[in-house]
């Protein structure tokens, strides 16, 4: 695992297909631990993982903390309501406090875009070896969610060999609030890297036309795309035109807390035009799964009966895949850091 190339995990745009394969392979192995009877591994014993969540979270925070504990790491949790932020302490100074207490990994979530990247840069400039893992920042990225969604789809399409090639040539439809979704952005990088064609569906106010070119060029700061040939991204306005031929459908929560202006006439009209139901899913054909990163607005993004139907809903499967996926990320980052420390000791001796 010493070949893992990422000191920090801040987005998925910099991931090669080999990087995705490394995460999926490990996550699949970790997912089988309860079956073998092993609940914990000593991989991160003696390491300290701090979860700095400046924004509310249920699934991401809980699964990162459980992932760290299953790898035998010590875990510290940060809560804004009981911190010194209310006294004027900066995000950087808060992070430095945890670094001073020995944190090896900071899992950072913040409502503002770019905070994990800035922390990683500032800590590195200070000579700190603590690594930063983005737990979701603003509208930018949610790497671990994109990876667990990838694992969920790969396991569905190829249960015996859930690797990136299971997505090659698949047509994945993502419906809803793309504009405000860091999950959608992470999935665009992940799915296209694995050769899937992604269809984005929603009203122009939530799915601007320029999203069709989202993965056409690497983002600023990344000199070149690590994926030689990506799947295509397209924008379709009507759900009945997007669903036929789909291999899987992901619907996204309407992020009303991020909508500064009136982008929808009503939730009822949104559900009428873009809400998923058993009837609508018949347009896809047989055995087409539905995903949702949660939390779900029942009766808005999809019907309650569809959400609760184990024959087609993979929502609980996504939750189950969260812990092993985040275990894989923590393991890879720790292995990379151990290799870097060994190299540093060797060069100084």
Swiss-Prot record:
Q: Which family does it belong to?
A: Belongs to the aspartate/ornithine carbamoyltransferase superfamily. ATCase family.
Gene3D superfamilies in the record: Aspartate/ornithine carbamoyltransferase
How it assembles, according to the record, is:
Heterododecamer (2C3:3R2) of six catalytic PyrB chains organized as two trimers (C3), and six regulatory PyrI chains organized as three dimers (R2).
Keyword Transferase tagged: yes
Q: In which pathway does it act?
A: Pyrimidine metabolism; UMP biosynthesis via de novo pathway; (S)-dihydroorotate from bicarbonate: step 2/3
- GO terms for biological process? 'de novo' pyrimidine nucleobase biosynthetic process; 'de novo' UMP biosynthetic process; amino acid metabolic process
> Which SUPFAM superfamilies does this entry report, sorted A to Z?
Aspartate/ornithine carbamoyltransferase
Which source organism does the UniProt entry give? Answer: Synechococcus sp. (strain CC9605)
Annotated Gene Ontology cellular component terms: cytosol
Q: What are its E.C. numbers? A: 2.1.3.2
One GO MF term? aspartate carbamoyltransferase activity
InterPro entries in UniProt:
Asp/Orn_carbamoyltranf_P-bd (IPR006132), Asp/Orn_carbamoylTrfase (IPR006130), Asp/Orn_carbamoylTrfase_sf (IPR036901), Asp_carbamoyltransf (IPR002082), Asp_carbamoyltransf_Asp/Orn-bd (IPR006131)
Question: Could you tell me what this protein does?
Answer: Catalyzes the condensation of carbamoyl phosphate and aspartate to form carbamoyl aspartate and inorganic phosphate, the committed step in the de novo pyrimidine nucleotide biosynthesis pathway.
**Residues given in the record as carbamoyl phosphate binding sites:** 59-60, 109, 142, 145, 294-295
Top EC group? transferase
The name on file for this protein is: Aspartate carbamoyltransferase catalytic subunit
